[in-house]
């Protein structure tokens, strides 16, 4: 048993080295004391840290740079997005740094504001335990915030983006295609790629939210010109996009197909449904014995027979969960409908 624990620690040591409670890390000449682990996923850990000098609290994301320079570039690109995107609804970072540790492993540290209220996912879990619903007014405000974040990404002015797009700048896919609309009104379109309640952080008043986790962001449209590219896109989507929120066009990518920002709109619909009913629309089908992938690809879901929500919210979900991407509304169209309802 002792050897088993030793082997486990040896395996995890590259991820947790120097980041135990009360340990201190130095980022760009500022010292921060680790308070506790807030969350983890993939190659990243998020810690609550306290500035040693002024005692302010922050969130620190530690990203493991696997696969050499490729991993470093991916993590640094994520940090760059957090630093340069100019929207109140996208999480901004304070600073970041590439760090090489004693064992030779490399990490990117990103320092963020600390959101003590946690994520929308935590609110959903609490409501599920209590058997209660989130108010429609609160949901509409959250959706408005998310639509503003998505509109910024999907209709991004090239001057606001971290840099002009290049062939190898995409994060989600290894062999990306240059977006075809970059010369059209100087717009650059990004897809977030992993919209879900866990990635929506609550402000102190719990009213507004910000979108986080930019590790899946990439430029769109992405065209799969052959089977090899189609498989690569599909594989990367399976790595980056959480399955219950993943758009059907990412499950079975075919040569000649194009991935657009409408994949985010599908995820928006899944997220809204989850906020309303505490489970994603397709997980409910699986709980009744179905296949998740099949349910998603067939857009097979249903609403509970009894619930407190208006027809409008259900119609928004239905509009977003169209199998054909071009039939889904844009973030701008969703925002217009949602804000109209809020202001009534």
Swiss-Prot record:
UniProt keyword list: ATP-binding, Endoplasmic reticulum, Golgi apparatus, Kinase, Nucleotide-binding, Serine/threonine-protein kinase, Transferase
Location(s), subcellular: Endoplasmic reticulum; Golgi apparatus
One GO term (biological process): regulation of vacuole fusion, non-autophagic
GO molecular function, one term: ATP binding
Active site: residue positions: 192 (proton acceptor)
Source species of the chain: Schizosaccharomyces pombe (strain 972 / ATCC 24843)
Lineage top rank: taxon: Eukaryota
Pfam families, alphabetized: Pkinase
Domain Protein kinase: from-to ranges: 76-344
Binding site residues for ATP: 38-46, 61
InterPro entries reported for this sequence: Kinase-like_dom_sf, Prot_kinase_dom, Protein_kinase_ATP_BS, Ser/Thr-specific_kinases, Ser/Thr_kinase_AS
GO cellular component: cytoplasm; endoplasmic reticulum; Golgi apparatus; vacuole
Keyword Kinase appears in the UniProt entry: yes
Catalytic activity: L-seryl-[protein] + ATP = O-phospho-L-seryl-[protein] + ADP + H(+); L-threonyl-[protein] + ATP = O-phospho-L-threonyl-[protein] + ADP + H(+)
Family statement drawn from the similarity comment of this UniProt entry: Belongs to the protein kinase superfamily. Ser/Thr protein kinase family.
Identification of the protein by name: Serine/threonine-protein kinase ppk13
Keyword Glycoprotein attributed: no
Enzyme class, UniProt record, top EC level: transferase
EC number(s) reported in the record: 2.7.11.1
